[in-house]
Amino acid sequence: MTRKRIMLMGLLIVPVSMYLVSIAISGVVNFRTLENLGFPDFDSDSLVFRNEKNIVWSPDSSKGKIIVLSFFFSSCPTICPAMNFHLKEAHDRLYGFKDLTFISCTVDPDTDTPAVLNKYKENLGVGNSNKWQFITGDSEDLYKLANSYYLTALKDSDSPGGYAHSQSAVLIDWEGNLRSRITDEGNILGAYDLSEAFLIDQLVDDVRVLVKEHRKVKLGQK
């Protein structure tokens, strides 16, 4: 290889390397978008809940924000502690993004009153966070919300703790549409498994994709 060719390769490699490093540092993902799976079939006006501060919350009240939606219950003896521990990691990594909110809904509203959820939030270490709300309300409406986004939520005497729910979260964009990555195999991922720490990277990466898309939309650059 000639000296001239080596110099040319160096001129190409250095800028590309610096660009990739800047992406890694900034957390910006530029190479893809997420599949739009559409708006769920429910009347969002009819679904009204309360958060851990006993403030009214509905899906419409988070319009304009990217939502990370999940379901749990405070007395869950199995997967919930790990789910919310891993969600906290995602929350902490994404805290700097303005138009983002985490919504965790109980499947046991009889037990999980606003006061109980507020204590749960404090114990999780996010008591002062304005980006994470813990939601309670009528069980039928909570289960309807879950099912509308293809998540499981129901009372089930055969399940540990008496309730069954998905161990995954879904991503909802600022217009209420369900969004998801396409896997390397060409399948729609749909929901983001919260049971293992290493799987949280998928969720964090895809939130960053939506954040970038949302910024472009707000700037009129669709």
Predicted regions and their residues:
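Hydrophobic alpha-helical segments, especially N-terminal targeting/anchoring helices
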Residues: 50-51, 172
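N-terminal targeting signals for export/organelle localization
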Residues: 1-48, 213, 217-222
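Short active-site neighborhood of thiol/selenol oxidoreductases, capturing the structured segment around
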Residues: 57-87, 102-103
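Structural microenvironment flanking redox-active thiols in thiol-disulfide oxidoreductases
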Residues: 83-145
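Thiol-/selenol-based redox modules, centered on thioredoxin-like
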Residues: 157-222
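Short loop/turn microsegments at loop-to-beta-strand junctions
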Residues: 44-45, 66-67, 166-167
